């Protein structure tokens, strides 16, 4: 997978880059594995904004992805590699030997026609899913469960992976993409390999409208607001805000650590991210 640069026919296209989509083998999704997607616009069940600067964007069909990989010891064939508008990674359509069809995240090196398997008997190759206790130390994995049977929650974005660096009793130690080293129960499932579409990080949007297609709205600076809207707001003319940068609720920005020290999961973090 690679990117290509567009011809500068307008200011918005001058620096714009897009994916070549050369790995895509099918243009329409499997109808039985799709459903409608209601726009949330950053609101919760009370209708209040919980994620700012969200709204709009193109209409999408949601592809139902198998993050649990709980169909064990049944071989599957990769029928197609498809585009998914709801995530940065590509997805692979699997046809199982018993006739069932499922989508999974497409890792690097997985191609149409390949055979994959989930379970204890699976080989250590991209796309196969095993429990962490059955994966050799040093292997890179993605779609990692945090709780057994809940489904993968870590390393699902394009190009991401974690490395299994040790096993200690009932825990496996993983080095996460952020550099954090944390313990995860060895009975959790993970998929071997790195998530595909690794050149996604090289894409340049080129214009504001392309962000709007993705459902991202403009970010207004605090110093440009009124005093009632932000701690940095107000003042005559342009001002610096008069204090250190903070969030709209007064929490210091620029590197202030906000993680609660009382979290039970703190004992599972061996090394925090960002530390040498």
Swiss-Prot record:
Free-text function comment from the UniProt entry: One of the primary rRNA binding proteins. Required for association of the 30S and 50S subunits to form the 70S ribosome, for tRNA binding and peptide bond formation. It has been suggested to have peptidyltransferase activity; this is somewhat controversial. Makes several contacts with the 16S rRNA in the 70S ribosome.
Lineage: Bacteria, Pseudomonadati, Thermodesulfobacteriota, Desulfovibrionia, Desulfovibrionales
Oligomeric and partner information: Part of the 50S ribosomal subunit. Forms a bridge to the 30S subunit in the 70S ribosome.
Biased composition (Basic residues): 256-276
Pfam families: Ribosomal_L2, Ribosomal_L2_C
Record keywords: Ribonucleoprotein, Ribosomal protein, RNA-binding, rRNA-binding
SUPFAM superfamilies in alphabetical order: Nucleic acid-binding proteins (SSF50249), Translation proteins SH3-like domain (SSF50104)
InterPro entries: NA-bd_OB-fold, Rib_uL2_dom2, Ribosomal_uL2, Ribosomal_uL2_bac/org-type, Ribosomal_uL2_C, Ribosomal_uL2_CS, Ribosomal_uL2_dom3, Ribosomal_uL2_RNA-bd_dom
Gene Ontology terms: biological process: cytoplasmic translation
Annotated protein name in UniProt: Large ribosomal subunit protein uL2
Keyword RNA-binding recorded: yes
Record family assignment: Belongs to the universal ribosomal protein uL2 family.
Chain residue ranges for the region called Disordered: 29-54, 224-276
NCBIfam families: rplB_bact
HAMAP family assigned: Ribosomal_uL2_B
One GO MF term: rRNA binding
GO cellular component: large ribosomal subunit
């Amino acid at each position: 997978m690679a990117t290509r640069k567009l011809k500068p026919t307008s200011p918005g296209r001058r620096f714009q880059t897009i994916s070549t989509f050369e790995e895509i083998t099918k243009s329409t999704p499997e109808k039985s594995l799709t459903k409608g997607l209601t726009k949330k616009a950053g609101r919760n069940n009370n209708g209040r904004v919980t994620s700012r600067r969200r709204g709009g964007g193109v209409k999408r069909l949601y592809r139902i992805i198998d993050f649990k990989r709980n169909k064990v010891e049944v071989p599957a064939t990769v029928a197609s590699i498809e585009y998914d508008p709801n995530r940065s990674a590509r997805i692979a359509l699997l046809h199982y030997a018993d006739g069932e069809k499922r989508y999974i995240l497409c890792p690097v090196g997985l191609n149409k026609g390949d055979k994959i398997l989930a379970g204890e008997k699976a080989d250590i190759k991209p796309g196969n899913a095993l429990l962490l206790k059955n994966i050799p130390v040093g292997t890179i994995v993605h779609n990692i469960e945090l709780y057994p049977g809940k489904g993968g929650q870590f390393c699902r974005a394009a190009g991401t992976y974690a490395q299994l660096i040790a096993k200690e009793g009932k825990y496996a130690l993983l080095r996460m993409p952020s550099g954090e080293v944390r313990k995860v129960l060895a009975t959790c499932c993970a998929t071997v390999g790195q998530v595909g579409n690794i050149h996604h990080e090289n894409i340049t949007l080129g214009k504001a409208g392309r962000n709007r297609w993705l459902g991202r709205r403009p970010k207004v600076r605090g110093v440009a607001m009124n005093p009632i809207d932000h701690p940095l707001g107000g003042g005559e003319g342009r001002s610096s805000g008069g204090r250190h940068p903070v969030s709209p609720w007064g929490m210091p920005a620029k590197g202030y650590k906000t993680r609660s020290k009382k979290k039970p999961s703190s004992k599972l973090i061996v090394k925090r991210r960002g530390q040498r």
